[in-house]
Amino acid sequence: MSDSSITMALDMKKGRIRIHKNTLHILGDPQYIQILVNDATMQLALKCIDKPCSGDQCHKTNAKNLDADESCEFYSFALVSKLRELIKEIDAKHTYRLTNGKHVKSHGIALFELSSIEKVES
């Protein structure tokens, strides 16, 4: 099921990943999020996990403690670099948004089509 409120932002210049609070709520306020990229299907997934895992794409969320208008932010130049390899049109100086993520409840993930990435106009 696709949901327009499942969104995230990617700041290519700062290497910042911002997951909107509502996205975390839809995912059940997970303690940790693992960010996965599938090159073959051109998809990005946010996977809910209960314990920290190895690797630089696993992040603590503190989702339940966020204020109403806050987002959860992580920094990962490795992820940003990977996305720039996959999506040639991405400009390293801009911020992009992934919207209409699909909540796959049975797998505890939010799934985004990388083809739907949109540049955020300043």
Predicted region positions:
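Glycine-rich loop/turn
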Residues: M1-K14
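A structural signal for short hydrophobic beta-strand segments in well-ordered beta-sheet cores
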Residues: M8-L10, I35, G101-H103
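Short beta-strand-centered segments at strand-helix junctions
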Residues: R16-L27, S76-R84
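Short, well-structured hydrophobic secondary-structure segments
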Residues: R18-H20, H25-K51
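Mature exported/compartmentalized surface modules and terminal targeting/interaction regions
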Residues: D39-A40, A45-S122
